Amino acid sequence: MIKLAYNKELPLTALHFMVSYKYETIVVEPMEDGLHIYENPVKVLANNPVFPYHLHHLNDYMYLTKKEPVNHFAKELLLETYSRGMGAMGLPGDLSSASRFVRAAFTKWNSLGGETEEENVSQFFHILGSVEQQRGCVQVEKGEYEYTIYSTCCNTDKGIFYYKTYYNSQITAVDMHKENLEGRELRKYPLLKEANVFRQN
């Protein structure tokens, strides 16, 4: 580990990395005593605390369900659901990293995929939307706030990167195969940060 920011516009922070290929996922965490690598059966990731904590913490939420809950409290009491989604009561809603990990895991494992790549990409961003940080809700310094600057995913088979930015929620795609992959120069694209509103009428 070195105390060198990879981007001068972003604060120095402990980074955690998730590496996935097809159906296998690992977590890489650079720590003071070296790199720690873990298999990641959950296939989501959050920042500190370390990954083993997040994995163990899921045990506290194994009772959550997408189904309508049944009365396990007391058979003698007439307890009924009065709203949809009550099977997920207790799902943490705060903005801490540990809570966002649980929320991302629950959403990922209970959401439904689509039939097309576009539907699956859209669903991916909905899953990430369940844990995104809104500007103004988490103050880190006076006048400075943590928020989700961008979200991204990639179709590794086709070499297509998809992303959204905080102010531009339209999904943007960058296709690597439309570039010269044998070239020697780095090709960069600016993040499309400004809102892109489709005016239907």
Feature roles, as predicted:
Residues S20-Y23, M31-D33:
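Acidic/polar residues in short coil/turn loops that connect beta-strands
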Residues V28-A46:
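Acidic, His- and aromatic-enriched active-site or binding-groove loops in soluble protein domains
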Residues I2-A14, Y21-E24, V44-N201:
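C-terminus-biased signal that marks the final domain/tail of proteins
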